[in-house]
Each structure stands twice: as structure tokens, then as C-alpha cells.
Amino acid sequence: MPLSDQEFRVKSDAALEQARRELMNLADEAGFELELQNGVLNLVFEEPSETKFVVSPNAPVRQIWVSAMGRSFKLAWSPELSTFALNSEPLVPLLDRLTRTFLGKST
């Protein structure tokens, strides 16, 4: 059963806040900024080049969209994982992997 508007808002807000919290150590270590404003999470890099990853909810389709490295990643709610995921990869591990790839760091 698809998420209602209210369920989507609550779950997407919680997912973005969890991502912000869980990426804080990597952000401190790697020197990039995490900005969560108006329901959108931005990962802002100055090195190795000025870049921004944008993580935002898309309410009409009940997905969280990640715009990073010239691509769009669309994560749907996974009842089995109790999180937003793309091909069974949850949001936080996806963002961690994309960030490390961008920074040229191994996991």
C-alpha cells in the first residue's frame, strides 16, 4: 500500500534528518558542509571541485530524489527495509558511497 501524503512527509523528513546526522562525521573528516533547510538536504563540497548534492522529497511520486555527480537517483519507500531505498540500497549508504566516490575515498 502506498504511503499517504502525511506518512510520506513524516518518513521523508525523518530520513533526511537521519542522513544529516549519520553523515556528520564524514563531513567533518572530509571537509564538506551538510545543510538541511526547508525539507531539502544539501551536501556542499569545495574540494576536489565546487559541487552540491541535493537530496529532496518528491511528494507527488512519494520518492526521495538525489541529484549527484550529474545523475538522478530516485528512492522509493521500502516496507521491507523500513526506509527509502534504490535497488535495496538505503538512502544513507547510497549518500555515503556517492560522497566517497566523489571524494576519491575508499569505503
Regions found by a protein language model. Give the residues of each.
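N-terminal intrinsically disordered, cationic/polar leader segments
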Residues: 2-54, 58-107
